[in-house]
Amino acid sequence: MAVKKRSIFEEVGQGAKAPVPQGGSIDRGHGGARRGIRLWLMALFLLVMAMIVVGGLTRLTDSGLSITEWRPVTGAVPPLNETQWAAEFDKYRDSPQYRLMNAGMTLAEFQRIYWWEWGHRQLGRVIGLVWAVGFLGFLAARRIPRGWWPRLLALGALGGLQGGIGWWMVASGLEGDKVTVESTRLATHLGLAFIILGLIAWQALLLGRSESDLLQARRQKDGRLVTLTTVLIGVAFLQIVLGALVAGIDAGRGFPTWPDMNGTFLPAEMFYVPGVETDWRNPAWWLGLLQNPGFVQFLHRMAGYTLAALGLIFWIFGRRSRHRATRGAFDLLAMALLAQILLGVGTVLSAAEWQVAIAHQVGAVVIWVLILHARHLALYPRVGSIRKGTL
């Protein structure tokens, strides 16, 4: 019987076809249309950002009280003829803002402010529709990654809550002798808008990388930078809310000087509340301070200085990261903070002229997103390569 000679270098099963490597359980278990959902979230992000800008312009043009009813569905159709316009104008003429601030306004002037508020509300309806179509579509196709549907559903729930808060805010300016909405309700409305925007941005950042990539990256996270950016998020959110309180009572127009406030560091009557005795133990006095232009403007400035100082200090720590992408994220954040400081000073010196004020608000959105981006890269760093020069 002949014995077949074999080389000691011959591989076992040389003729067999090698099996194709399979992904791990992480990649298999978290499938779905990650790229499609991310694009959908990015569209929602742009719409919410536009909503914040249009909302700011609606406030700056004193248009927010031009529609005196809340009709989420039927309100999507604006007045289409002279009779409908006259009826809508009559409703506005019954409001305190018309009687006390805009008496004698013409129909053409009313139409200009009406379109701002209608556009703001219509944009909200578009956001709701885009969310619903996307969520239900991905859900029906069973393309939502495992564990993600509660997060995406929560975005829609928060959007619905935001619509209700928007009307709650508007309603505060339609009673008594009010000509503007309550500043605290405005701050609640804007604060929730930034929360929604931040959640959308964070989910989009996560979906931009695979689950396995995120898991591996997290093993090299920089805990210190994660903590620092978390602190920065808190300070930035406080500053956003304070900015809304300033805007709600036009406090920026009463102190058009910098770095002083009409010649002093502490504005005159900073702790004065009409009709309420100054008492640190009295809650009514504390609430009344939120309507004091000098008090809220001073807090807004101090919070701005704090945010800028912390941001620049944290930038020094960010520059020490061994990951190039993380260092770049902190560089961008530092530059945005410097630009926002200039816009803030410009807003003060121009007595909150609308062009500068809206640029300042857009700057807040940019900084908010850049802080989240820096935190994301601190938590999930992109590992560079010496060979590719990406360290």
Swiss-Prot record:
GO biological process: heme A biosynthetic process
Domain of life the protein comes from: Bacteria
Enzyme class: oxidoreductase
Substrates-to-products reaction catalysed: Fe(II)-heme o + 2 A + H2O = Fe(II)-heme a + 2 AH2
Entry's Gene Ontology cellular component terms: plasma membrane
Co-factor requirement: heme b
One GO molecular-function entry: oxidoreductase activity, acting on NAD(P)H, heme protein as acceptor
Membrane topology annotation: Multi-pass membrane protein
Disulfide links within the chain: none
Protein known as: Heme A synthase
Protein's organism: Cereibacter sphaeroides (strain ATCC 17023 / DSM 158 / JCM 6121 / CCUG 31486 / LMG 2827 / NBRC 12203 / NCIMB 8253 / ATH 2.4.1.)
Gene: ctaA
